[in-house]
From Swiss-Prot:
Domain of life: Bacteria
HAMAP family (alphabetical): SmpB (MF_00023)
Main location group: cytoplasm
Localization (cell): Cytoplasm
Gene: smpB
Protein name per UniProt: SsrA-binding protein
GO cellular component: cytosol
UniProt similarity note: Belongs to the SmpB family.
A GO biological process held by the record: trans-translation
A family per Pfam: SmpB
Length: 158
């Protein structure tokens, strides 16, 4: 029986699809501007970023498509919007670097994971270059080979 890999205690959610679809060139850490009910829902583990992406407007970065499912008990006086646009908190130089790469070099900016840092929610974003179909196949083939190699070593030790 295979063991389930445990996610780190401070990790909220991860975008596994992004590492399959893109070559990640560089990563950045960004804060998220959240409302109170969103923080409460994130603590309950109700956040997903698999369909999320990042866009730039007026020298600011925004996270689109991140889904935070509201809790029934926490948002009684507010009408929650589960897929609203959330502002990413980055330094001006980081925003300029990301914006320049996305506009000129054909890169994409994707969210990789969200995690707790002290009591703040942080989002790890990556400057990514899209993979072609043959690159994806090669990645899967290499991963399978590494897995088979490890199995072979374990059988030899037993």
């Amino acid at each position: 029986m295979s063991k389930k890999s445990k996610k780190p205690e401070n990790q909220i959610c991860a975008n596994k699809k992004a590492r399959h679809e893109y070559f990640i060139e560089e990563t950045f850490e960004a804060g998220l501007s959240l409302q109170g009910w969103e923080v409460k829902a994130i603590r309950a583990g109700k956040m997903t970023i698999t369909e999320a992406y990042i866009i730039f407007r007026n020298n600011e970065a925004f996270l689109f498509g991140a889904h935070i499912q509201p809790l029934l008990s926490s948002s009684t006086h507010v009408s929650p919007d589960s897929i609203r646009t959330r502002k990413l908190l980055l330094n001006r130089r980081e925003i300029e670097k990301l914006f320049g790469a996305v506009n000129q070099k054909g890169y994409a900016c994707v969210p990789l994971s969200c995690y707790w840092k002290n009591s703040l929610v942080k989002c790890q974003i990556g400057l990514a270059l899209g993979k072609k179909q043959h690159d994806k196949r090669k990645t899967l083939k290499d991963r399978d080979w590494e897995r088979d190699k490890q199995r072979g070593f374990k059988k030899d030790l037993d």
